[in-house]
Amino acid sequence: MKGKNPVSIPKKYQEILFSIGTYAEKLGTKAWIVGGAVRDFYLGRDTLDIDLSFEGNVDPLAGFAVKRWGGSKNKFSQFSTFRVNLSTGLKLDMVRARRESYPRSGVLPEVTPSCIKDDMFRRDFTANAWALSIMPGSFGASFDPFGAQKDIDAGIIRILHPKSFLDDPTRMCRAVRFAGRFGWKLAPKTEELLKEAVKQQYPLLLSRERLTREFLKINKEKEIKRILEMMRAYGMLQLVYPGLEWHDGLNRVKTVDERLGVMVCSLGKSGEEFLKSMRVKKELAQEILEAWKVSESCHAPLRALTPMQQAVIRAVHPGRKKYALEPCFLRGRD
């Protein structure tokens, strides 16, 4: 049975966070750790990324952190958010507590400054709607207005309100990503609403960039097989790209780039179009494209393949002979 203070801030972060909380108090504002970091602290998982929410101006607090511990800060003015990379290795997303409203589905929200409870309510799932105070007089105190601890203990992914997937369809991808990562399940009502969101094709309301970004996050997950199987079962994969399925070759590669290469090659003739839709860096796209061309061809490559290209082709075509991947240099009229 957990005690009254069920989650604690790791000692290695306490000095920095206590100092930020103390400075926030001097400025007359309240400060909290929010989101996934609190969840991970509770689960005993290490993290170097911490979200902080303030009920006041963030600018001087971001400046204080960089001046005190060194590093850099970048401001994202649309949401008054600062990304602070400290020289200690700790990464802080420092935001103004806010309320969000969505003018229409699939677009970024309109925001207004607000309190910590409203800031919790704008979160994707109850498990991420948990806050810890970093104020001097209440350092580490838990604020759990929507039952985060209870749902984490039960291994449940639960949205906070019925319009959640309509407001932000990226939450559909995050629901299966977190469920796969932690081995959790969707709450019955959340699952019902997700199925309806798939039926209504909510993900297609997103820009291709936002949908791609969420899928590439899934591609980085250790439990990618479990996640893709969930997406297939719910009909979500076909909304990312028609014909996309789990391929056993994904078990035979090690890197995120190789995974993407396997997906491209496993799609056959439509692989090139899928690759273009992913909008990855030009150099990576070209490397995968060359692997796809060899994968689709019955001929040996005209130039030496990179280790990544070889790994992808062997994963998709485990029966292809080694010599078939060696370059064929043409001479004369041959």
Task: Put a short name on every predicted segment.
Residues 1-334:
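Catalytic cores of the polymerase beta-like nucleotidyltransferase superfamily
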